[in-house]
């Protein structure tokens, strides 16, 4: 195997990270010469990055092929018509890069490929005998990310492995989904990632069920609620919890209005002379679900989760109502709103409030609130319905056992979906079943962010000196360097490099005319798992220095044994 000589390689390392780099992976990928920024959310992948990404892709391919996946390569440029068939041309909004050709035709750059793969299935699959099918590709995707940041964690151009399963029924989908879940677990384990699979929100993808694969890191932008006792885990967009019961007073026979001039926040109502604790307040929020008003009610000390509201309403998109949209509907401005006996729009109430009494809420009149509200009598009895709306908090009870939930930041590295017939029905992708009836194909969709695996590995595996790569995705298995300029050291190093190559070990040979300290520092920065140093004193005794990047003392290894030792280390870790 051919070694790469550092003196001839393009490895533009930097002493300092860019000023705008906030997370470890961004800082280190730039400093170690893996990436350079071309524009907001757009990166050049330099040779070291390309080597590591190729290894990630190879692992993904192996595990996809192992479950019967067949690799495609479909266009990144899509005509608008195919997205309009599924109804997602408008749903994707500003997140989609759109363009026109010279004839005025509408096109987009693909964010994902459900529509394109469904079109292939529609045109080519005719019978249940052709199913199941598992198709995948590893391809460039585009997303007009509004706030690109954090290096490779939030970008506008990225590489995705997207796979799609096609089955004749739900039972087949369940099997395909579990095959993908197991394959994902193998992929992430092989890439050196500690991960957790969590229940997730399907968003614009649709479907009946989805799971995200998350890496716990402060660089993540998702929040996961997990129980260490029973291993329940869910994105907070879907997570539920047990909330301690509140001891309410008997309340009043009917709600009583009282003046609250200038009081428009939960916090203000907590202050004297009112002194109403936030947990005794009803927070009433006005949203637009597919541009239709909906009222969401949570406890005053809780936060509304918009993903849960979207799920509860079944809407394609939800947004907070604009200030000018609220008074014509509610009769008051935000800060004085309530849902008592309100019937002019759909009202959704978090289940934790169902049996609350003696609550306080806005009176739908500026400067006034109501006390003594009985939720069941004054809200639910007038047409409101219960729906999971609140965001769970750390310390709340696990919904599955007596444990308590931990809530932590996490980074999504993969997402799998049971799409069902969402796309096949809208795009008329059908097959004949065993009884000769035309039925819509039952689909699943399964995505992995290739660059995110690289970035996540660095977030998990780094120290003050640089990257600490897992062996399987390191750009090289080993680096060989000399500790002096003497010709005999160079000759011995060349022989070690050749022996490593014969054993299949990928080597970066640091043949630069630099001090040993510089070479050691760069080796640590690049994160190459094995460092082999050839020095005068050790060589005189027939040894070379051996050190693992992930820690451990320097060992002296006989020159004739170092290649075998390295090969064994590589095999054990990959």
Curated annotation (Swiss-Prot):
The keyword Metal-binding does not apply. GO terms for cellular component: cytosol. It catalyses: tRNA(Pro) + L-proline + ATP = L-prolyl-tRNA(Pro) + AMP + diphosphate. Keywords: Aminoacyl-tRNA synthetase, ATP-binding, Cytoplasm, Ligase, Nucleotide-binding, Protein biosynthesis. It holds the Pfam family tRNA_edit. CDD domains: ProRS-INS, ProRS_anticodon_short, ProRS_core_prok. One of its GO terms (molecular function) is ATP binding. Its EC number is 6.1.1.15. InterPro entries: aa-tRNA-synt_IIb, aa-tRNA-synth_II, aa-tRNA-synth_II/BPL/LPL, Anticodon-bd, Anticodon-bd_dom_sf, Pro-tRNA-ligase_IIa, Pro-tRNA-synth_IIa_bac-type, Pro-tRNA-Synthase_IIa_type1. PANTHER family: MITOCHONDRIAL RIBOSOME PROTEIN L39/PROLYL-TRNA LIGASE FAMILY MEMBER, PROLINE--TRNA LIGASE. Belongs to the class-II aminoacyl-tRNA synthetase family. ProS type 1 subfamily. Homodimer. Consists of three domains: the N-terminal catalytic domain, the editing domain and the C-terminal anticodon-binding domain. HAMAP family: Pro_tRNA_synth_type1 (MF_01569). This is Proline--tRNA ligase. The gene is proS.
């Amino acid at each position: 195997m051919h070694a790469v000589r550092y003196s001839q390689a393009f490895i533009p390392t930097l002493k300092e990270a860019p000023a705008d780099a906030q997370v470890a992976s961004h800082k280190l990928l730039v400093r170690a010469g893996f990436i350079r920024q071309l524009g907001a959310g757009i990166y050049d992948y330099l040779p070291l990055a390309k080597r590591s990404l190729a290894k990630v892709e190879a692992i993904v391919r192996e595990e996809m092929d192992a479950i019967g996946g067949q690799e495609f390569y479909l266009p990144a440029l899509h005509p608008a018509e195919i997205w309009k068939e599924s109804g997602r041309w408008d749903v994707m909004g500003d997140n989609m890069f759109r363009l026109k050709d010279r004839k005025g035709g509408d096109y987009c750059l693909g964010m994902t490929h459900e529509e394109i793969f469904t079109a292939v299935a529609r045109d080519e699959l005719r019978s249940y005998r052709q199913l199941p099918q598992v198709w995948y590709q590893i391809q460039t995707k585009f997303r007009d990310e509004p706030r690109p940041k954090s290096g490779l964690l939030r970008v506008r151009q990225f590489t995705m492995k997207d796979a799609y399963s096609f089955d004749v029924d739900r039972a087949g989908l369940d099997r395909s989904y579990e095959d993908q879940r197991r394959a994902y677990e193998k992929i992430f384990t092989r890439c050196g990632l500690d991960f957790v699979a969590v229940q997730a929100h399907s968003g614009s993808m649709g479907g009946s069920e989805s799971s995200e694969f998350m890496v716990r890191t402060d660089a993540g932008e998702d929040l996961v609620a997990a129980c260490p006792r029973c291993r329940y885990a869910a994105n907070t967009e879907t997570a539920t919890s047990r909330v301690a019961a509140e001891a309410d007073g008997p309340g009043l026979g009917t709600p009583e209005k009282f003046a609250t001039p200038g009081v428009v926040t939960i916090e203000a109502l907590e202050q004297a002379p009112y002194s109403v604790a936030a947990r005794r307040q009803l927070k009433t929020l006005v949203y637009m679900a597919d541009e239709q008003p909906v009222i969401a009610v949570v406890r005053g000390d809780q936060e509304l989760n918009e993903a849960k509201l979207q799920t509860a309403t079944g809407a394609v998109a939800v947004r907070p109502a604009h200030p000018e949209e609220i008074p014509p509907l509610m009769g008051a401005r935000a800060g004085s709103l309530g849902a008592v006996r309100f019937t002019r729009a759909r009202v959704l109430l978090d289940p934790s409030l169902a049996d609350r009494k003696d609550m306080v809420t806005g009176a739908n009149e500026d400067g006034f609130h109501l006390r003594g509200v009985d939720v069941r009598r004054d809200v639910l009895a007038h047409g409101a319905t219960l729906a999971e709306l609140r965001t769970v908090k750390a310390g709340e009870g696990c919904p599955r056992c007596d444990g308590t939930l931990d809530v932590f930041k996490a980074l999504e590295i993969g997402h799998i979906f049971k799409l069902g017939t969402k796309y096949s029905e809208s795009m008329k992708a059908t097959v004949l079943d065993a009884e000769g009836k035309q039925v819509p194909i039952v689909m699943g969709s399964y995505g992995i962010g290739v660059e995110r695996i690289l970035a996540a590995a660095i977030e998990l595996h780094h120290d003050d000196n640089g990257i600490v790569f897992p062996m399987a995705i390191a750009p090289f298995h080993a680096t060989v360097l000399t500790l002096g300029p003497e010709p005999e050291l160079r000759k011995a190093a060349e022989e070690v490099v050749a022996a490593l190559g014969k054993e299949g070990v990928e080597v970066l040979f640091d043949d630069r005319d630099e001090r040993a300290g510089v070479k050691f520092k760069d080796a640590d920065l690049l994160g190459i798992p094995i460092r082999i140093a050839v020095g005068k004193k050790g060589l005189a005794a027939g040894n070379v220095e051996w050190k693992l990047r992930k820690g451990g003392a320097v060992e002296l290894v006989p020159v004739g044994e170092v290649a075998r030792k390295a090969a064994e280390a590589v095999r054990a870790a990959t």
